[in-house]
Amino acid sequence: MRMSAKAEYAVRAMVQLATAASGTVVKTDDLAAAQGIPPQFLVDILTNLRTDRLVRSHRGREGGYELARPGTEISIADVLRCIDGPLASVRDIGLGDLPYSGPTTALTDVWRALRASMRSVLEETTLADVAGGALPEHVAQLADDYRAQESTRHGASRHGD
């Protein structure tokens, strides 16, 4: 999965907003500074998030943004779909419409499994989970497994493998 910078910034901004006390409005410049996001780029991102009703904006001198719902009710998938569209696609073609035949026919099921796996992680992980550092158990286990594989892989490559 390749995530655009815009989507990654959006997730970071939303997690940052999830750390604000309920009813607290965060100014765009403060949000940009907290996450190192270019302010003008963040304005565009927040506009998309507002259009999809993931954030609420407040005008005026004391204005800013807040989550439209509690962080426990907004998944990482919600944010990514708002910014980048579907979670996984192959050349922007529906999986049922891929022109696979013969020995490549089963690839459609590989892409389905990939999409289901990503969807499971991204839909079940909320902004509050990330902000609180307490990921769902299966997500934390997948992350631990990945770190172990990386450690093994990098250790093996250092020893000439």
Swiss-Prot record:
GO terms for biological process: regulation of DNA-templated transcription. InterPro entries: TR_Rrf2-type_CS, Tscrpt_reg_Rrf2, WH-like_DNA-bd_sf, WH_DNA-bd_sf. Keywords: DNA-binding. It comes from the Bacteria. Residues 2-132 form the HTH rrf2-type domain. SUPFAM superfamilies: Winged helix' DNA-binding domain. GO terms for cellular component: cytosol. GO terms for molecular function: DNA binding; DNA-binding transcription factor activity. Signal peptide: none annotated. Was identified as a high-confidence drug target. This is Putative HTH-type transcriptional regulator Rv1287. The lineage of its organism: Bacteria, Bacillati, Actinomycetota, Actinomycetes, Mycobacteriales.
